[in-house]
Amino acid sequence: MANDLPIAAVVRIAKNNGAERVGSDAAQAIADASQEYIAELTREASKYAKHAGRKTIKKEDVDLAVNELNI
């Protein structure tokens, strides 16, 4: 799967959370894992929106999905 997350943003987030340096392969691995997390969260939140008769995902759908996925 192609990754749509900018590597510079991934590195910046990692550094803002304690990493002093981030290798390019590590940044790519973090980006890939993050994209999969976002995809799974979106799939789950979409189920809640559809169940409520909506096409638009709302914050409440994301909150429910986070709880459902235990993340």
Language model regions located:
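Terminal helix-to-tail segments of small alpha-helical proteins
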Residues: 1-71
